[in-house]
């Protein structure tokens, strides 16, 4: 039977936090932390409201474009299809916004009841 030799490990195994000693953050970590702390501190609610506001602006723009197209008499089938597509897109966006708002209100109610 051959001899199997196990080499002794030369590295030190750290078993407690005290043995680790103080850890200094790198310059990159400090810069990332400072950047994160200096960002807008309005919170998640403010971010959500801003996103909904941005969606509302694009929604209003799409609606006004559609109204402009509908005001002009169009005989070209391609233009009619583009108008129909715009109307479908607006309808889908409207439904998604309504569903999102409903889900958000349900989540807020759940948080306020369970908190």
UniProtKB/Swiss-Prot annotation:
Keyword ATP-binding on entry: no
InterPro entries attached to this UniProt entry: T3SS_YscI/HrpB
Positions of disulphide bridges: none
Keywords: Plasmid, Virulence
Induction: At 37 degrees Celsius in the absence of calcium.
BP GO terms, sorted: protein secretion by the type III secretion system
Keyword Transferase: no
Signal peptide stretch: none
Coiled-coil ranges per UniProt: none
Function: Belongs to an operon involved in the translocation of Yop proteins across the bacterial membranes or in the specific control of this function.
NCBIfam families given in the database record: yscI_hrpB_dom
Entry's family note: Belongs to the YscI/HrpB family.
Protein name, UniProt field: Yop proteins translocation protein I
Organism: Yersinia enterocolitica
């Amino acid at each position: 039977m051959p001899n199997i030799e196990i080499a002794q490990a030369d590295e030190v195994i750290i078993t407690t936090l005290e043995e680790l000693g103080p850890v200094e953050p790198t310059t990159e970590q400090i810069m990332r932390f400072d950047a994160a702390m200096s960002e807008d501190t309005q919170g998640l609610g403010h971010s959500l409201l801003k996103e909904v506001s941005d969606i509302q602006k694009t929604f209003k723009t799409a609606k006004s474009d559609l109204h402009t197209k509908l005001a002009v008499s169009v005989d070209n089938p391609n233009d009619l299809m583009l108008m129909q597509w715009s109307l479908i897109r607006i309808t889908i966006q409207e439904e998604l916004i309504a569903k999102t708002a409903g889900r958000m209100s349900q989540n807020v109610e759940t948080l306020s009841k369970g908190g």
